[in-house]
Amino acid sequence: MGEEQSTVSGGGGPQESQTLASGTAGHPEPPRPQGDSARAPPLRAASAEPSGGGCGSDWGCADTSAPEPARSLGPPGWSKSRAPAQPAGLALTGPLNPQTLPLQLELEEEEEEAGDRKEGGDEQQEAPPGEELEPRTRVGAADGLVLDVLGQRRPSLAKRQVFCSVYCVESDLPEAPASEQLSPPASPPGAPPVLNPPSTRSSFPSPRLSLPTDSLSPDGGSIELEFYLAPEPFSMPSLLGAPPYSGLGGVGDPYVPLMVLMCRVCLEDKPIKPLPCCKKAVCEECLKVYLSAQVQLGQVEIKCPITECFEFLEETTVVYNLTHEDSIKYKYFLELGRIDSSTKPCPQCKHFTTFKKKGHIPTPSRSESKYKIQCPTCQFVWCFKCHSPWHEGVNCKEYKKGDKLLRHWASEIEHGQRNAQKCPKCKIHIQRTEGCDHMTCSQCNTNFCYRCGERYRQLRFFGDHTSNLSIFGCKYRYLPERPHLRRLVRGSVCAGKLFIAPLIMVLGLALGAIAVVIGLFVFPIYCLCKKQRKRSRTGMHW
């Protein structure tokens, strides 16, 4: 390291020459401003010898024959001759942690005050008339250094400025183009030049932010801090680009703005995204419950929960509002509905298998064995023809006869109802847990009666399945123990309606025609009579 000379002027007194060492290569000590433009209160070097009768220090004087050993101004190993000379009135302590800076300052002040009282006694410095004594203050910088500002006589109207730079370390920020780079702010007159350290992340300076810090100036002066902060962070939409669900809309689109609307299901005001099909308001909780119930029923094409809307919800909207387990079931039902008759899932693990027919003519012994399938995933052996576990030595027709046991169990009455009821269309057994007799098959959407197993039918003027005298009525609603009489009564009512209805219609038409003909003759006569009566009344009055 090279050495350089620094001269400190102390209010017109003799100049003192000190030797200093540059602290960091490539960052020399900035020169102090000279002349009238940089006038500052007279400062004295901490190591200046006392002149006259006093020691010339604000810390009190002890024995002048035994001067106080100078504190180390730098890291261990620095000598007094190698220590950098500081401006008069400023003492530089060792590097401190910025996070624990206030605590370290308080501890250091207490130690120094205790040492001063011990060595110098209770001597105090008095200020001459017309001047005030500046209290001893400290200003911390972000680079870990502390500036001790010693008390000094100065006019009360003097203004002191301390310029420091704070650098914020950036991480993972893209470099700005040359046209958008900001130039560093110009230093005010009388201030030392600001040396920016080399940056490894970004080559452009951060925008300038000047903040008033009057709390750092206890003497009424102003301390200006120039902060070089990082540029503003990038917004998430600009980094992410176009949203991945921008085409969904409605509840399935997380980028649609929320609006406080009343849910059509629970009738509560909530932040709701309108449905994409009918733009109606359904809250997320109600929609998730509805979709989960539909998936549990095996529905693939799920209708809109709004009764006025007859459209089906989009697949993306359904998947977005389902849980992980329900989403797996829904995707399985989708695949099951898209396949043809040559592809079936495994009864155990739901792995899809495609059956390829061979060109040879099957023999009676091999006609059934060709449908034997072994699942490559779970090694389960099953029959592709009847979609059941493999039945060795038994054909599919005989194996299906085993369903008689199931039908017998389903027809048994327990707790006042059947154990199960078979759908009249797809022939699957359905067990009711609660509710009325009107059932809807989850496989084929057929409406049937759980009590009798017949479809729900209705015809205007002839009644529906709940009518006692209708031919479409349930057999358990009218004379369940006398089926022949029930059929006779219902048949007679139906025949009577068939024959009486036309007669009533013809009679009604005839009466209507007669009324029209009579009206054509009676209405003009009535009008003439009424007019003649008015004339007769007016003649009698005159």
From Swiss-Prot:
Gene3D superfamilies per UniProt: 1.20.120.1750, Zinc/RING finger domain, C3HC4 (zinc finger)
Catalytic activity as recorded in UniProt: [E2 ubiquitin-conjugating enzyme]-S-ubiquitinyl-L-cysteine + [acceptor protein]-L-lysine = [E2 ubiquitin-conjugating enzyme]-L-cysteine + [acceptor protein]-N(6)-ubiquitinyl-L-lysine
Enzyme class: transferase
Amino-acid positions noted as binding Zn(2+) 4 in the UniProt annotation, renumbered to this chain: 449, 452, 465, 474
Residues binding Zn(2+) 1, per UniProt: 263, 266, 283, 286
Tissue expression from the record: Mainly expressed in testis and skeletal muscle.
A GO molecular-function annotation: zinc ion binding
InterPro entries to which the protein is assigned, alphabetical: BRcat_RBR_RNF217 (IPR047551), E3_UB_ligase_RBR (IPR031127), IBR_dom (IPR002867), Rcat_RBR_RNF217 (IPR047552), RNF217_RBR_vRING-HC (IPR047550), TRIAD_supradom (IPR044066), Znf_RING/FYVE/PHD (IPR013083)
ZnF RING-type span: 263-309, 423-452
Residues reported in the UniProt entry to bind Zn(2+) 2: 383, 386, 391, 396
Residues holding Zn(2+) 3: 423, 426, 441, 444
Domain notes: Members of the RBR family are atypical E3 ligases. They interact with the E2 conjugating enzyme UBE2L3 and function like HECT-type E3 enzymes: they bind E2s via the first RING domain, but require an obligate trans-thiolation step during the ubiquitin transfer, requiring a conserved cysteine residue in the second RING domain.
UniProt protein name: E3 ubiquitin-protein ligase RNF217
Organism this protein belongs to: Homo sapiens
